[in-house]
Amino acid sequence: MAYPLQYGLQDATSPIMEELLHFHDHTLMIVFLISFLVLYVIFAMLSTKLTHTSTMDAQEVETIWTILPAVILVLIALPSLRILYMMDEIYNPALTVKTMGHQWYWSYEYTDYEDLNFDSYMIPTTELKPGELRLLEVDNRVVLPMELPIRMLVSSEDVLHSWAVPSLGLKTDTIPGRLNQATLSSTRPGLFYGQCSEICGSNHSFMPIVLEMVPLKQFESWSATMI
């Protein structure tokens, strides 16, 4: 989860998020290099008295500033496309969960089980227990097994929503009449928080998401009690 005054991304909990963190660092270094180069050129132009008003043509310089940006764009695009295709790949999911967005709560259905579904509402501030997080706790958490590929099918019953869990690198739009899918896999147990990330009305801020990633045996025990 995020902390006050945190300027970086959340700690990665999935392979996809780890790739996104590496891509973020890779791109940020390129941006820094470009920024330093531009600032150096500006400083050099302002601080020197030498001018080249007679220069009308410089083929070498034009070639460099045409090829160099193209190379930089390729260096950014290739890892980006790789991650994009990785996010679309789903290999034999061990579990499928369908989530529907509503104004203003989420409903979940474990499609591999005959009757395992529930609604998930935010717990009001007045009902929070000591240690619980304001605007992030829900009455029913989404319990999932860790270290297994899980497919999420997302849609909406009313307006546009967005099902997002930053530490897992997930953000999928929920669109009425359309079924989108995403894949997730957690490398460690714990509670992972998210929220609706598409403005959907007056209570948009009150649609938290809580994933509880547990070992497989614990998930099987939980699912047996819920059926």
Swiss-Prot record:
Keyword Electron transport appears in the UniProt entry: yes
Record EC number: 7.1.1.9
Keywords, in A-Z order: Copper, Electron transport, Magnesium, Membrane, Metal-binding, Mitochondrion, Mitochondrion inner membrane, Respiratory chain, Translocase, Transmembrane, Transmembrane helix, Transport
Signal sequence range: none
Catalytic activities: 4 Fe(II)-[cytochrome c] + O2 + 8 H(+)(in) = 4 Fe(III)-[cytochrome c] + 2 H2O + 4 H(+)(out)
Cofactor: Cu cation
Membrane topology according to the record: Multi-pass membrane protein
Cofactor detail note: Binds a dinuclear copper A center per subunit.
UniProt xrefs under SUPFAM superfamilies: Cupredoxins, Cytochrome c oxidase subunit II-like, transmembrane region
Disulfide bond residue pairs: none
Binding-site list for Mg(2+): 198
Pfam families reported for this sequence: COX2, COX2_TM
Residue numbers binding Cu cation A2: 196, 198, 200, 204
Record-listed Cu cation A1 binding positions: 161, 196, 200, 207
Places the protein is found: Mitochondrion inner membrane
Transmembrane segments: 15-45, 60-87
EC supergroup of this enzyme: translocase
Mitochondrial intermembrane-facing ranges: 1-14, 88-227
GO biological process: ATP synthesis coupled electron transport
Function: Component of the cytochrome c oxidase, the last enzyme in the mitochondrial electron transport chain which drives oxidative phosphorylation. The respiratory chain contains 3 multisubunit complexes succinate dehydrogenase (complex II, CII), ubiquinol-cytochrome c oxidoreductase (cytochrome b-c1 complex, complex III, CIII) and cytochrome c oxidase (complex IV, CIV), that cooperate to transfer electrons derived from NADH and succinate to molecular oxygen, creating an electrochemical gradient over the inner membrane that drives transmembrane transport and the ATP synthase.
Self-association and partners: Component of the cytochrome c oxidase (complex IV, CIV), a multisubunit enzyme composed of 14 subunits. The complex is composed of a catalytic core of 3 subunits MT-CO1, MT-CO2 and MT-CO3, encoded in the mitochondrial DNA, and 11 supernumerary subunits COX4I, COX5A, COX5B, COX6A, COX6B, COX6C, COX7A, COX7B, COX7C, COX8 and NDUFA4, which are encoded in the nuclear genome.
PANTHER family: CYTOCHROME C OXIDASE SUBUNIT 2, CYTOCHROME C OXIDASE, SUBUNIT II
Family annotation (NCBIfam families): CoxB (TIGR02866)
Protein name: Cytochrome c oxidase subunit 2
Gene symbol of the encoding locus: MT-CO2
